[in-house]
Amino acid sequence: GKRTAGVDGIKLLTPQQRIKLVNQLKITGKSQPTRRVMIPKPGTNESRPLGIPTMYDRALQAVVKAALEPEWEAKFEPNSYGFRPGRSCHDAIGAIFLSIRYKAKYVLDADIAKCFDRINHKALLDKINTYPRLQKQIKSWLKSGVLDQGEIFPTKEGTPQGGVISPLLANIALHGMEERIKQFAGKSINQRREISLIRYADDF
């Protein structure tokens, strides 16, 4: 999606244009619709919808992400590995190995179908609970709509795959999943300790 244009038709910027864009960035609580682009899913005949923001919105999303990420990195569960700085799928594999190394365990391998597309906007915004201006801007991106074949459709749920801030928003939405599952595992502390939930984005 990096070299795909949004509704502004811009794919790349020169260094001079980037400097000019940075000087224009301002949190206004407004945004442009994303542009729908379909890309093939590896190993299947299905396609995945991307929502490509304008170049301006991409740059502003990077700024807002830089403001939010440190706070949430301090909160995120230690066994969450996807879309996080300094972490990779190899770290997730290592965590799985350590979890099953000394004792046989049942393993449930699952992923959340269409996770990005089904995130509840109100629940996510309530969870973020940041400064009003940032909150308004994030809500604007979530509600910006999507341009598909010349027609703009409303976005009532989800965060567009293709947005700079979307992976962080998805991780925020899924934060607390491990603790919630452990609450249903059993009443005793030992029963809860027996469960390891190792998550890489929407795969766990």
What is each stretch, according to the model?
Residues 1, 66-82:
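Charged boundary/loop elements
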Residues 7, 66, 110-112:
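Residues immediately flanking
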Residues 24, 29, 37-38, 75-79, ...:
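Conserved polymerase palm-domain catalytic core
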Residues 33-36, 49:
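Short glycine-rich loop/turn motifs
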Residues 37-46, 68, 153-154:
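Residues forming anionic-ligand binding surfaces in small-molecule and nucleic-acid pockets
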Residues 40, 44-53, 61:
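Glycine-rich active-site/cofactor-binding loop and its immediate structural neighborhood
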Residues 60-68, 169-170:
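Active/ligand-binding-proximal structured segments within catalytic/core domains
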